[in-house]
Curated annotation (Swiss-Prot):
Family: Belongs to the Bowman-Birk serine protease inhibitor family.
Keywords: Disulfide bond, Protease inhibitor, Serine protease inhibitor
Name this protein carries in UniProt: Bowman-Birk type proteinase inhibitor B4
One example GO MF annotation: serine-type endopeptidase inhibitor activity
A GO term from the CC aspect: extracellular region
Site (Reactive bond for trypsin): 14-15
Tissue: Expressed in bulb (at protein level).
Functional description taken from the UniProt entry: Serine protease inhibitor. Inhibits trypsin (Ki = 110 nM) and very weakly inhibits chymotrypsin (Ki =1200 nM). Does not inhibit bacterial subtilisin.
Keyword Disulfide bond assigned: yes
Paired cysteines (S-S): 6-55, 12-17, 26-33, 30-47
Gene Ontology biological process terms from the UniProt entry: negative regulation of endopeptidase activity
């Protein structure tokens, strides 16, 4: 499916983007996101292309 462009997120990690919006969005260092299944059932989006970027929680 289509991979959305990433904009802003409220929590960032080296390779993960944790998004608070229904549409997956990451900080500007992340180029693309893909949804990852988790045991908790909470939506988790992994950054396919990641550039080092300081992101405050």
């Amino acid at each position: 499916g289509q991979q959305p462009l990433c904009n802003d997120c409220f929590a960032c990690a080296r390779s993960l983007c944790i998004c608070g919006d229904l549409v997956p969005q990451c900080h500007e260092g992340c180029q693309q996101c893909e949804k990852v299944d988790t045991l908790s059932g909470k939506p988790l989006y992994q950054c396919r292309s990641f550039e080092d970027y300081q992101c405050a929680n």
